[in-house]
Amino acid sequence: MNDDNSLKGITHRFRGYLPVVIDVETAGFNPATDALLEIAAVMLDVDAQGNWVIDETVTRHVHPFEGANLDQAALEFTGIIPDHPFRKQIAVSEKIALQDIFRVIRHQLRKHQCKRAILVGHNAAFDLGFVNAAVERTGIKRNPFHPFSTFDTVTLCGLAFGQTVLSKAVDAAGLGWDPAHAHSAYYDAEKTAELFCMVVNRWRSRHS
């Protein structure tokens, strides 16, 4: 990455806000009661040609918090088995998962001289709701994300590609969707990031 291009492209593109793509996989729809099971965060950068690209992805499997609800329909939808032996070996607590991801985000904020992160997600309010609920549960004091503002790729993809469902938007954009990897936080976050970068790059000339 060209550091000068990166700073110019990221620091000022969104008024000092750093877009970070987040996807969560959960055991339900209620962030106050339902378990957070996976979280992935995709960091973005600007290449030597001035295009927005994926920089790095951080992902964690998460142990359900004590007393968390595990909705069977949600588990069947995602295919996640919370008590699978392999998953139990690699999963971490909500607090550790968030601390690990927030540490990387803070490094990116310093690197790009941005004042705060802004969450990018497909149905972003859902992801931000679970992140904020986990932050409150774990007592983490420094949440790098704006508390309510987001970039939602549902809206962006509806405008750019005429599709609002993630898989259909990815196909419409010509990025290729693999159903076998769907509902993995890592895969969904990276595909969301690819869509976001494509939309931003299409509008680059208007903001250069």
Task: Report each predicted region and the residues it spans.
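Conserved non-catalytic scaffold segment of RNase H-like nuclease domains
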Residues: 2-122
